[in-house]
From Swiss-Prot:
It is an enzyme of class 1 (oxidoreductase). This is L-lactate dehydrogenase. It is found in: Cytoplasm. GO terms for molecular function: L-lactate dehydrogenase activity. GO terms for cellular component: cytoplasm. Pathway: Fermentation; pyruvate fermentation to lactate; (S)-lactate from pyruvate: step 1/1. It comes from Mesoplasma florum (strain ATCC 33453 / NBRC 100688 / NCTC 11704 / L1) (Acholeplasma florum). HAMAP family: Lactate_dehydrog (MF_00488). Homotetramer. The modification Phosphotyrosine is found at Y222. NAD(+) binds at V16, D37, Y68, A121, S122, N123. It catalyses: (S)-lactate + NAD(+) = pyruvate + NADH + H(+). Catalyzes the conversion of lactate to pyruvate. The active site is at H178.
Length: 317
């Protein structure tokens, strides 16, 4: 009999993970959810809390706290577990602790017999996605990093504010590391179908404005962490959008973490690039013809990620 429902397992029931689940149940992402956390009481409490929405929301679902055994027949696993980023700490400085955590999670999921798609948002996202895929040996297409989805959403909002248009009217994207070395691919940016260069030529936005938008986009997490200790709503909604594209086989373009195998002149690790998302994960990496400056910046970002991945391998050896 053909399966007619989707099962999603969340590993890590902190603020990011539960923001994703809250977004998911509100938008009817799946019919079954399982929460896994090293703190089983927290997982149980969160499951009960979400159960209290079942009589109000339109689309039916079940949710419970579970174990890695529940991964066996899951369609999608979303991993948000890990030590949180401290004020002033870069994502890459999280590497040793969270690499060891990710290795344990990967081994437990692999042992369950899971055969679906995994989406990873734990930081440093690009490196930990690479660690997970290497430890599990899963097909690289079935492992998806959150990549620069959130970074790009931030950039689109900031550029939209400068031009006084809706964020959805802006197609401007950030590539590379989900973090400080990322690259704003303005050469490919459009606003309401027009290249951003047209708005520059007309004086509606300046190069300084674009530089400010990019700088603020990559520093936004630090601004939020300084004020409230953590970021979670934005990434939670982004994770739901990524998950929806996978479960519904949308063939949508996203700036997620995909493993490079020669694309953009890089190889052997995950980073944020434009891809087509479908039911099997990321299907195709789209290679943009970047400007020379963007190519150089992307290479620099990839070099930093590769060096950090080598440190991650040492941490889990």
């Amino acid at each position: 009999m053909k399966k007619t429902s989707n099962k999603v397992v969340l590993v890590g029931t902190g603020a990011v993970g539960m923001s994703f689940i809250y977004s998911a149940v509100n938008q009817g992402l799946a019919e079954e959810y399982v929460l896994i956390d090293v703190n089983t009481k927290a997982a149980e409490g969160n499951a009960i809390d979400i159960q209290d929405t079942m009589a109000v929301l339109d689309k039916p679902f079940t949710i419970k706290a579970g174990t890695y055994e529940d991964c066996k027949d899951a369609d999608l696993i979303v991993i948000t577990a890990g030590r949180p980023q401290r004020p002033g700490e870069t994502r890459l400085e999280l590497i040793a602790d969270n690499s060891r955590i990710m290795k344990g999670i990967a081994e437990a999921i692999k042992a369950s017999g899971f055969n679906g798609v995994t989406v990873i948002a734990s930081n440093p996202c690009d490196v930990l996605t690479t660690v997970y895929q290497q430890v599990t040996g899963y097909d690289e297409h079935s492992v998806v990093g959150a990549g620069t989805t959130l970074d790009s959403a931030r950039l689109r909002r900031l550029v939209a504010e400068k031009l006084n248009v809706a964020p959805k009217s802006v197609n401007a994207y950030i590539m590379g590391e989900h973090g400080d070395s990322s690259v704003a691919a303005y050469s490919k940016a459009t606003v309401m179908g027009q290249p951003i260069s047209k708005y520059l030529a007309e004086g509606k936005i300046t190069e300084a404005d674009l530089e400010e938008c990019w700088t603020r986009a990559i520093r936004m997490a630090y601004e939020i962490i300084e004020r409230k200790g953590a970021t979670y709503y934005g990434i939670g909604v982004c994770l739901n959008a990524i998950s929806s594209a996978i479960l519904r086989d949308e063939k949508t373009t996203f700036m997620v973490g995909a493993k490079l195998n020669g694309e953009y002149g890089q190889k052997g690790f995950y980073t944020g690039v434009p891809v087509i998302l479908g039911s099997k994960g990321w299907e195709t990496i789209i290679e943009w013809d970047l400007s020379d400056a963007e190519k150089a910046a992307f290479k620099k970002s990839c070099d930093a990620l590769d060096a950090t991945y080598q440190k991650a391998k040492e941490a889990i050896a």
